[in-house]
Amino acid sequence: MAKATVNGIEINYTATGKGTPLVLIHGHPFDHTMWYPQVVDFSDTYHIITPDLRGFGKSGLPANSAGTKFEDYSTDVLCLMDYLKIDNFHLCGLSMGGQVIMEMFRQAPSRIKTLIFADTFAGLDTPEVKQGRYVTANRLEKEGMGPYSDEVICKMIMPEHVTSRPGVAAHLLKMMKGTSPVGAAIALRARAERIDYLADVLPKITIPTLVMVGRKDEFTPVAKAEELKENLQNCKLVIIEEAGHLPGLEQYEAFNKSVLDFLIAV
C-alpha cells in the first residue's frame, strides 16, 4: 500500500503489475480490498490501481464534511492519476464506484480508454431513496457500522452465500464494520445530491463500455443494467448468474473472465 496527498486529502492506494493501467473503484461502504480477486488475476497483464475513496479504508476523512460534493470522489482519483503520471487508463467501478467513474468521465473523457460498470445505475434516486440515504447516514453516525453491516450482508451477497461462502461474508463484514461511520455518512449525503448521469453523461459516452450485474442483485437489479445498456452507444451487457450485488467476490471467475474478454477485444 502507498499514500498520496492529492486534492487536499490523503488517499491510500495499491499499484500492482505492469501494462496498461486499469483503475478499480470500490463501492459503499467498502474499501480497495474488495478487488483482491481481480488484482490477483489481472496484474499479470495490467497495471492495477485500487484506491480507497476519501473517508473509506485508510484514506483520510474530509476536513469539511458538510462541504463534500459527490464529484470530489472522482476528482481525488483523477488527481491520484496525475500524481502517478498516468495519462490514460481503463476504468471499472462497482455500485457507488460506478457512479464515481461516470463523474470521472464527465470531468476527463479524453483520459479514459474504456468503462466497466458493475452493479450500478445512472439515474437520479427516487425521492424515497434519496431521503433514505440521509436517514441511513444519520443512523451510521449514531449507531456505528455494526448493526447496519449485519442487517445488509444478506443483500450485499445472495443470502445463501453468507453460509456457503463464509470467507466472502467475513471479508465483507470486516470491510463494512471497519469503515468510518463518518466517512460512510458523508458519502451517502454526497451521493444523494449527485447529478443525473443518465441524462447528462451517458449520451456523451462513445468509448467501449461493459455493463455487468449479478442476476440476483437486490440493490441494482438487472433492469437497471439493461437501462444502462439501452443508453450507451458502444456497450456489452453481461449478467453474472448466481450472484448478488458483488459478483466480483461471489462469482469472481465469471466476473474476471468477462472483464478480461472485454479488454482483450478492445
Predicted regions and their residues:
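Flexible "cap/lid" loop of the alpha/beta hydrolase fold
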Residues: 99-107, 111-149
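Short beta-strand/loop motif that positions the catalytic acidic residue
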Residues: 205, 211-213, 217
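Conserved alpha/beta-hydrolase catalytic His-Asp/Glu region
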Residues: 125-131, 142-204
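Conserved alpha/beta-hydrolase "acid-adjacent" motif
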Residues: 218-224
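Alpha/beta-hydrolase fold catalytic core
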Residues: 1-22, 44-46, 82, 86-87, ...
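Active-site glycine-rich loops that stabilize anionic/oxyanionic intermediates
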Residues: 27-30, 95
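Catalytic active-site module of serine/aspartate enzymes centered on a nucleophile-bearing elbow/loop
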Residues: 235-266
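Active-site loop/oxyanion-hole signature of alpha/beta-hydrolase fold enzymes
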Residues: 7, 36-93, 108, 257
